[in-house]
């Protein structure tokens, strides 16, 4: 494929991610667009298909193919600058072995469109989770709620308000969180 291996990422051609409050992202690590707002699937005028075919997604795809580094992908660029294997690098190797993204990219290069057949999708429908991973936080894991009051000063005011909304909206301060999964095989990488 005629793409720059230094910047190319297969995720915008093969993946989409949502947040518990309905926000749609090009991947779980992506920063918001330049206007600071990701579309929300809970908005009746917008859906995953619209996002997948949006000019925003096509601009990101173009940048990655042409060797540019979109700011939305800065988390991966920062990791790579520090000699850490990023999600982009992992998925490039992983998906290359499975040939998951070759056809969508070839189709895109000809038509500037990726078919709405998303092979990898991450749907976060709520923040209820029975794990407390170190890289996570209350937006994505209810197990972090008990620690939130101790660490919230390290987050921005907007994040604090949003997390407080989740905590209070789900009555998580008073309710014990149920474990949803009892075995590891419920989780798919």
How would you label these PLM feature ranges?
Residues 168, 182-183:
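Glycine- and small hydrophobic-enriched segments that form the cores of compact globular domains
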Residues 82-119, 131:
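Recognition helices and adjacent regulatory flanks at domain boundaries
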Residues 1-95, 120:
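Accessory C-terminal segments flanking Radical SAM cores
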Residues 26-34, 123-176:
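Canonical Radical SAM [4Fe-4S] cluster-binding loop centered on the CxxxCxxC motif
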Residues 104, 111-112, 171-180:
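Short glycine/proline-rich turn/loop motifs
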Residues 13-22, 111-139:
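N-terminal pre-triad scaffold of radical SAM enzymes
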Residues 184-189:
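Radical SAM/AdoMet-radical enzyme domain recognition
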